[in-house]
């Protein structure tokens, strides 16, 4: 993590030859103008320095951010305070106000207003909360809620404000916000009914032109809920992480603030050759565009001092920024006192007993093959499909949504459900052919497991740099895998074998259904699946099974869907059980050759879990 200062000087190329009449008559401020930009992003409900899931104190939260903001203001600095989205999913803090205490003002709205935010961007996980939540938030917060490329399907007009103009010390600041556009393959349509996303580069070109012609701002800030490393081919339409692509392909931005990737950016962009954050990013005209972005859960936040001098009909703009380690600041007592009643209400809710387990469940075993953890998820999906949707499904899909999940034996509480199932996914019963199911499995296991040529090879498919070396992720203190664990899709209801010595497309051998029925490639089956996967998330159904993305978005293959998230039904299931629950492993699949697997697991476990 780079924490040192980086100083970038930008000579603005705006000579204002095309400014409107009102701007020609404008009197510009004299001398050096200063203000400080602070961005929070991907807070994911970390409002208090306390983890409601683990029941442990934390050293970063919005309470510490509040202390830092007060410090800046006490120093006499003018602060431009921005949030970049993904706040409405994660901790039970926001879930409680999203779906339980819905008649009360949302705690996130209250926090934004308390801290006097200037503008707020929209993230994909904010959209995931659904219309009822974000339509309420936009009415409650004082700051404008922004997103230029989340548009009305019919009119193509932005659903939220596309940009805002803010004045600080006489400087006219334009803030254009964009959301990562891949939500149409990540989220069920019901969560953003009537809306669509536009490609970030295309949207930026359109709106930067409008802003320049209509507003004639002194400085333009991109507030993008998307990562800087484009991860796929840079020409990918609706690229999920196109922030740096916008900087490199669209003139007009002075600085870009990013989110979504949780990586932390301190001025420099991603160098695709070295795979490091070392690239000086330049616009098409050659202007340096610094990229800053925070780390999730308020761990690190960008703080950028801006100095501007208007001379010779142009602005000389300098940025001096760093990533602030929020853990070095105490929680703001006034902040905590103000929201104490909310914290107590959430604490009471998450501490509620809902059942008892005889079996300890951990997701680390699920990273390497059949496990008690995934067996439990599969059984829950079969049960929920039957009891809530009235469907006897043939197959279930499930993945370890977190590689670090632990559900201890003993009393089970509401908070434990956020470890077992961390995302607000809905639940579908879909119709898929046997071939499509098989293709999904091949796609999953090809990205999950390496193709082993000898017993010394890696079992897990790890990312590699240009030199063929594994890539260590300092933030997670482990080596990066080709795809996250939440894409490690396994299957219930079928007996099958995964051979890691076989090439792509030939790893999976399906023997039969677990009830003895033959599995037929040309026959249609009912499949239990979460809404992320069913909407195209991870590419299993689109790239793996070759199903058109629009078909998935329109839910054409969905027979039935829940109207609440899976976690709600899992909590309900626990509360209906009598006595302690013993989980049995399904034992319906295995990875071979066993000696290769055992050797690979022993080696790779240390790379994924170096602290265990």
Residue ranges of predicted features:
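Short secondary-structure capping/junction motifs at helix and strand boundaries
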Residues: 2, 145-146, 392
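Sec-dependent signal peptide recognition
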Residues: 2-10
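Residue-level detector of alpha-helical recognition elements and their boundaries
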Residues: 8, 135, 271, 452-456, ...
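Intrinsically disordered, low-complexity regions enriched in Ser/Pro/Gly/Gln/His and often acidic
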Residues: 9-12, 582
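C-terminal motif of bacterial Sec signal peptides marking the signal peptidase cleavage site
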Residues: 15-18
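Acidic, metal/ion-coordinating pockets
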Residues: 20-324, 328, 373, 377-380, ...
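Catalytic centers of hydrolytic enzymes
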Residues: 26-36, 45-55, 59-74, 186-201, ...
């Amino acid at each position: 993590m780079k924490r040192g200062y980086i100083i970038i000087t930008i000579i603005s190329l705006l000579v204002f030859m095309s400014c409107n009449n009102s701007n020609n008559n404008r009197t510009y401020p004299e001398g050096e103008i200063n203000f400080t930009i602070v961005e929070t992003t991907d807070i994911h409900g970390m409002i208090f320095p306390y983890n409601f899931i683990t029941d442990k104190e934390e050293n970063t939260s919005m309470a510490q951010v509040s202390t830092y903001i007060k410090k800046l203001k006490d120093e006499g600095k003018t602060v431009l305070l921005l949030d970049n989205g993904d706040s409405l999913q994660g901790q039970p803090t926001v879930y409680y106000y999203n779906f339980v205490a819905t008649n009360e003002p949302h705690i996130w709205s209250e926090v934004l207003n308390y801290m006097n935010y200037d503008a707020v961007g929209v993230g994909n996980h904010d959209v995931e909360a659904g219309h009822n939540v974000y339509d309420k938030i936009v009415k409650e917060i004082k700051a404008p809620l922004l997103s230029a490329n989340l548009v009305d399907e019919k009119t193509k007009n932005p659903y939220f404000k596309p940009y805002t103009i803010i004045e600080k010390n006489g400087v006219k600041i334009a803030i254009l916000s964009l959301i990562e556009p891949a939500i149409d393959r990540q989220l069920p349509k019901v969560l953003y009914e009537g809306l669509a996303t536009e490609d970030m580069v295309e949207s930026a070109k359109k709106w930067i032109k409008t802003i320049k012609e209509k507003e004639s701002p002194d400085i333009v800030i991109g507030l993008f809920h998307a990562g800087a490393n484009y991860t796929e081919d840079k020409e990918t339409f609706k690229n999920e992480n196109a922030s740096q692509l916008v900087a490199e392909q669209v003139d007009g931005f002075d600085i870009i603030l990013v989110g979504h990737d949780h990586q932390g950016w301190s001025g420099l962009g991603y160098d695709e050759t070295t795979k490091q954050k070392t690239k000086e990013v330049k616009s098409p005209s050659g202007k340096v565009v610094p990229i800053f972005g925070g780390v999730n859960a308020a761990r690190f936040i960008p703080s950028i001092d801006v100095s501007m001098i208007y001379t010779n009909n142009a602005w000389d703009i300098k940025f001096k920024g760093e990533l602030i380690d929020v853990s070095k600041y105490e929680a703001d007592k006034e902040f905590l006192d103000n929201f104490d009643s909310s914290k107590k209400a959430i604490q009471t809710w998450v501490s509620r007993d809902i059942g008892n387990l005889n079996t300890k469940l951990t997701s680390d075993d699920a990273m390497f093959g059949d496990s008690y953890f995934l067996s439990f998820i599969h059984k829950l999906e079969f049960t929920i499909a039957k009891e809530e949707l009235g469907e006897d499904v043939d197959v279930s899909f499930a993945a370890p949504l977190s590689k670090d999940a632990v559900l201890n034996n003993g009393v089970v509480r509401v908070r434990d459900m956020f470890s077992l199932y961390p995302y607000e996914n809905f639940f579908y019963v879909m119709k898929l052919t046997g071939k499509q199911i098989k293709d999904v499995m091949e796609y999953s296991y090809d990205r999950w497991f390496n193709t082993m040529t000898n017993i010394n090879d890696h079992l897990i498919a790890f990312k590699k740099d240009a030199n063929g070396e594994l890539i260590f992720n300092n933030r997670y203190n482990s080596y990066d895998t080709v795809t996250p664990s939440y894409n490690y899709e396994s299957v219930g209801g079928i007996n099958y074998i995964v051979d890691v010595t076989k090439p792509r497309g030939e790893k999976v051998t399906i023997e039969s259904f677990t009830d003895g029925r033959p599995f037929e490639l040309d026959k249609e089956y009912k499949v239990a699946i979460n809404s992320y996967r069913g909407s195209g998330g991870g590419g299993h159904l689109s790239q793996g099974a070759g199903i058109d993305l629009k078909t998935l978005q329109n839910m054409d293959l969905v027979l039935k869907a829940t109207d609440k998230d899976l976690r709600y039904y899992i909590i309900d299931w626990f509360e209906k059980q009598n006595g302690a629950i013993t989980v049995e492993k399904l034992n319906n699949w295995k990875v071979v050759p066993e000696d290769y697997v055992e050797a690979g697991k022993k080696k790779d476990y240390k790379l994924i879990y170096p602290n265990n």
